[in-house]
Swiss-Prot record:
Catalyzes a trans-dehydration via an enolate intermediate. It comes from Azorhizobium caulinodans (strain ATCC 43989 / DSM 5975 / JCM 20966 / LMG 6465 / NBRC 14845 / NCIMB 13405 / ORS 571). The gene is aroQ. The record marks 19 as: Transition state stabilizer. It catalyses: 3-dehydroquinate = 3-dehydroshikimate + H2O. This is 3-dehydroquinate dehydratase.
Amino acid sequence: MSDTIHVLNGPNLNLLGTREPGIYGAATLADVEALCRTTAAQHGLELVFRQSNHEGDLVDWIQAAAGSVGVVLNAGAYTHTSVALRDAIAGTGVPAVEVHLSNVFAREPFRHHSYLSPVVRGVICGFGPQSYVLGITALATTRPARP
């Protein structure tokens, strides 16, 4: 198993810091990345941090993460629409945590359904950038012991 954790971000997360700050906060994606790098390093892990507005990129990156510690995935709106992301997680068996900056259950009803939740280890939402920290920590501290 690789000592790498993948943090993958979906559509519109490149707009963090300017997009609806009342919902998503003032932190930019670069701020989130810095927080993730610090957290991964505290657990002795390398970090791959990526963002794309394109579903196929996310599928490719999930597949490439097979054999790693896992994936922390904020799929954005694809959470509620993407069978392809669901199938990539299920098909690779990569340990994954679904994260969201906002509490999706306190928002519009269409955000309450996730195609990803049934195939990930856990879901963390509503803690802003700390959702990522919690996701990284969860994967780092629950991974199988190395032989």
